UniProtKB/Swiss-Prot annotation:
This is Acyl-CoA (8-3)-desaturase. GO terms for biological process: unsaturated fatty acid biosynthetic process. GO terms for cellular component: endoplasmic reticulum membrane; mitochondrion. One of its GO terms (molecular function) is acyl-CoA (8-3)-desaturase activity. A motif (Histidine box-3) lies at residues 382-386. It comes from Papio anubis. CDD domains: Delta6-FADS-like. The histidine box domains may contain the active site and/or be involved in metal ion binding. It catalyses: (8Z,11Z,14Z)-eicosatrienoyl-CoA + 2 Fe(II)-[cytochrome b5] + O2 + 2 H(+) = (5Z,8Z,11Z,14Z)-eicosatetraenoyl-CoA + 2 Fe(III)-[cytochrome b5] + 2 H2O; (8Z,11Z,14Z,17Z)-eicosatetraenoyl-CoA + 2 Fe(II)-[cytochrome b5] + O2 + 2 H(+) = (5Z,8Z,11Z,14Z,17Z)-eicosapentaenoyl-CoA + 2 Fe(III)-[cytochrome b5] + 2 H2O; (11E)-octadecenoyl-CoA + 2 Fe(II)-[cytochrome b5] + O2 + 2 H(+) = (5Z,11E)-octadecadienoyl-CoA + 2 Fe(III)-[cytochrome b5] + 2 H2O.
Length: 444
């Protein structure tokens, strides 16, 4: 359907509401004009994307689409946010238009919204501050124990190794806590979440909060959607991911890597390398290129603290060795945990599906246990986390049975597996997609 030359000009809001069809909204998904729909209201976000507090890309990923459910999922004070959005309002959907596109399951969406209302009434969106305080204290204890190990027992091999393990655990657990704060799930106000987020991710880890939010919010908005989820940006230059994209790549006769061997070289360029050889340097480029000076200042305090506490005990050379070992161990831990929920799942281009279908087809869980909860920072409840990204993690297990019932009713697969099986499935999926690429490359 060709765009109407009259309608192509963005109308000015007047006293009488302007009405639009889904076709008109869908046409505004490019670089010049971007519209989206929330609760049947049509908003022109073309200029606003650059000022969006959550980042320009995450909101742009919903241009031309209904964004009601992600809007609810990502914003705490929705009434206040909508007041600020009034200046972007240009009209609403015509009365004869459905509330969302035909690619979305109406019954599933309606029932999920009822489930969300139930979850809020049950108080499952409210944080237990004692839980998070104890969690922070356990991180500080691990961090302090690492230094005390060297101070008390000296710098021989075994104390050095124990220090590295304790410091790695502290770094990983700080990573899980900053994840909670980045999702605004610890405090009732955004201000306090942001402030403590800077402390945990910046001072305790040496990572910029703005970089994490920029990347992670996109992942949650469109998980496993190529071109929109930065977590799968390693396709196609390093890995061929997913059945559909791998076959597509093979048919195009593109070969950046020997993908049929990717399940082998994953062990070399995946878990061991991501943090020490990429994240470690890229975060500095990010904050300097985007002039995020507050983030840079927090990061510098992390390195000053480490230098002042460890160099007097170890000397500079041994300290640098310790730092690299910690980042190496952290990288392995981080990559296996963060990839086990998504890489084995469906990966495709954005098909503009409803919120529940988008999250469930791209996400799986790992069975609950005290160790799995701690080891993964409760990311073993990835399905619940993706459906309710602002829910405090200590409530995931409470909402899980309700989510399972919703999935069973609508014939949606709810995957949960043992931890080691989840790790193995990463390798199995890489092997399968690599073979699919090879078959398409050679024979299609």
């Amino acid at each position: 359907m060709a765009p109407d030359p009259v309608a192509a000009k963005t109308p000015v809001q007047g006293p009488t509401p302007r009405y639009f069809t889904w076709d008109e909204v869908a046409q505004r998904s490019g670089c010049e004009e971007r519209w989206l729909v929330i609760d049947r209201k049509v908003y022109d976000i073309s200029e606003f994307t650059r000022r969006h507090p959550g980042g320009s890309r995450v909101i742009s990923h919903y241009a031309g689409q209904d964004a009601t459910d992600p809007f609810v999922a990502f914003h705490s004070n929705k009434g206040l946010v909508k007041k600020y959005m009034n200046s972007l309002l240009i009209g609403e959907l015509s009365p004869e238009q459905p509330s969302f596109e035909p690619t979305k399951n109406k019954e599933l969406t309606d029932e999920f919204r009822e489930l969300r209302a139930t979850v809020e009434q049950m108080g499952l969106m409210k944080a237990n501050h004692v839980f998070f305080l104890l969690y922070l204290l356990h991180i500080l204890l691990l961090d302090g124990a690492a230094w005390l190990t060297l101070w008390i027992f000296g710098t021989s091999f075994l104390p050095f190794l124990l220090c590295a393990v304790l410091l790695t655990a502290a770094q990983i657990q700080a990573g899980w806590l900053q994840h909670d704060l980045g999702h605004l799930s610890v405090f009732s106000t955004s201000k306090w979440n942001h402030l403590v987020h800077h402390f945990v991710i910046g001072h305790l880890k040496g990572v910029p909060a703005s970089w994490w939010n920029h990347m992670h919010f996109q992942h949650h908005a469109k998980p496993n959607c190529f071109g929109k989820d930065p977590d799968i940006n390693m396709h196609p230059f390093f890995f061929a991911l997913g059945k559909i994209l791998s076959v597509e790549l093979g048919k195009q006769k593109k070969k950046y890597m020997p993908y049929n061997h990717q399940h082998k070289y994953f062990f070399l360029i995946g878990p061991p390398a991501l943090v020490p050889f990429f994240f470690q340097w890229y975060v500095f480029y990010f904050v300097i290129q985007r002039k995020k000076w507050v983030d840079l200042a927090w990061m510098i305090t992390f390195y000053i603290r480490l230098l002042l506490t460890y160099v007097p005990l170890l000397g500079l050379k041994a300290f640098l060795g310790l730092y690299f070992i910690v980042r190496f161990l952290e990288s392995n831990w981080f990559v296996w945990v963060t990839q086990m929920n998504h890489i084995p799942m469906h990966i495709d281009h954005d098909r503009n599906m409803d919120w529940v279908s988008t999250q469930l087809q791209a996400t799986c869980n790992v069975h609950k246990s005290a160790f799995n909860d701690w080891f993964s920072g409760h990311l073993n409840f990835q399905i619940e986390h993706h459906l309710f990204p602002m829910m405090p993690r200590h409530n995931y297990h409470k909402v899980a049975p309700l989510v399972q019932s919703l999935c069973a009713k609508h014939g949606i697969e709810y995957q949960s597996k043992p931890l080691l099986s989840a790790f193995a499935d990463i390798i199995h999926s890489l092997k399968e997609s690599g073979q699919l690429w090879l078959d398409a490359y050679l024979h299609q």
